[in-house]
């Protein structure tokens, strides 16, 4: 995922809204994220249409179930031709290994297996929430680093994490391990419901592999300009 452009989170309720948004980006080769709301509303057809538009896809369904179920789910997802899928690291090593096995079994001959990453802790999770609501006494950063090690041991390609945790993760895993980071905002944007946020430039400085950007692009007055502005900051180039 070297030189990956900002991944746009398509947090829309319908295909119609999604296509109206994407129609603005004529000539752009986009990497987009399809989450639960859009996929559950539109099904695999949304993926087919996005691929016809030339989009690379991160299918963000965060699978978390018993190993056998996750294996079967990933085997089906492997046939969709997406670039990136994920599971929850909290499902444990056996579940993550089963997810990888399912992807390998379901990827059509001659095609590249989708990259598989594990969600460590959601960017909406705070240390206080971890301790008071989830009754996890281990510090937030320690859980993220531990989950990252576990994901690598399970054969996964990387993790979803906060930018602030990436440098700590790279002290514990190999340099080619992917760190995909949501919670990206420009300095003058609102944080909304995410508490561990960062700018594209800060993400670049911390050496993350890819950034995921939603509202800063999708809710901008000029989404194309916002996308390019974020891209320039992410790449460290002048607009």
Swiss-Prot record:
Cellular component terms per the entry's GO annotation: cytosol
GO BP, one annotated term: 'de novo' pyrimidine nucleobase biosynthetic process
Catalytic residues identified in the record: 62 (proton donor)
Keyword Lyase in annotation: yes
MF terms in GO: orotidine-5'-phosphate decarboxylase activity
Enzyme class: lyase
Sorted UniProt keywords: Decarboxylase, Lyase, Pyrimidine biosynthesis
TM annotation in the entry: none
PROSITE patterns for this protein: OMPDECASE (PS00156)
Subunit structure: Homodimer.
NCBIfam families: PRK00230.1 (NF001273), pyrF (TIGR01740)
Family stated for the protein in its record: Belongs to the OMP decarboxylase family. Type 1 subfamily.
Protein name, entry field: Orotidine 5'-phosphate decarboxylase
Gene this protein is translated from: pyrF
